[in-house]
């Protein structure tokens, strides 16, 4: 999926609004995913997936940091996410549908917190961005 110049501007602007809340929002998105799609917990058998868990917070920060890195490398998402793609495809063997589920939960989380700051155009751009990230993360499954 090709990100337009407007999409890239919307993504960067939204990431600036997220600011220092990335880890918090990442953890909340994971909690939302675990609650809404319980089968996703099977990839975290060693985690305490309860609300406020230190492990979920830590992984939420990793998710947020990876997405922030991707948002800063919009012209080279495959390069920015190559190591994560390898990890998820070859070591963790995560079902690719889970990236879409987490992306949806992240959009809901951002809409909850940013409210009017997440315009329809920004929402559409983030949706395209998360779909692109999902595509890159699953590219090494083939």
UniProtKB/Swiss-Prot annotation:
GO terms for biological process: hydrogen peroxide catabolic process. The keyword Acetylation applies. The keyword Membrane does not apply. GO terms for cellular component: blood microparticle; haptoglobin-hemoglobin complex; hemoglobin complex. The modification Phosphothreonine is found at residues 109, 135, 138. O2 binds at residue 59. Red blood cells. Residues 2-142 form the Globin domain. GO terms for molecular function: haptoglobin binding; heme binding; iron ion binding; organic acid binding; oxygen binding; oxygen carrier activity; peroxidase activity. Heme b binds at residue 88. Coiled coil: none annotated. Pfam families: Globin. Keywords: Acetylation, Heme, Iron, Metal-binding, Oxygen transport, Phosphoprotein, Transport. The modification Phosphotyrosine is found at residue 25. InterPro entries: Globin (IPR000971), Globin-like_sf (IPR009050), Globin/Proto (IPR012292), Hemoglobin_a-typ (IPR002338), Hemoglobin_oxygen_transport (IPR050056), Hemoglobin_pi (IPR002339). The modification N6-succinyllysine is found at residues 8, 12, 17, 41. The modification N6-acetyllysine is found at residue 17. The modification Phosphoserine is found at residues 4, 36, 50, 125, 132, 139. Heterotetramer of two alpha chains and two beta chains. Belongs to the globin family. Involved in oxygen transport from the lung to the various peripheral tissues. This is Hemoglobin subunit alpha. It comes from Cricetomys gambianus.
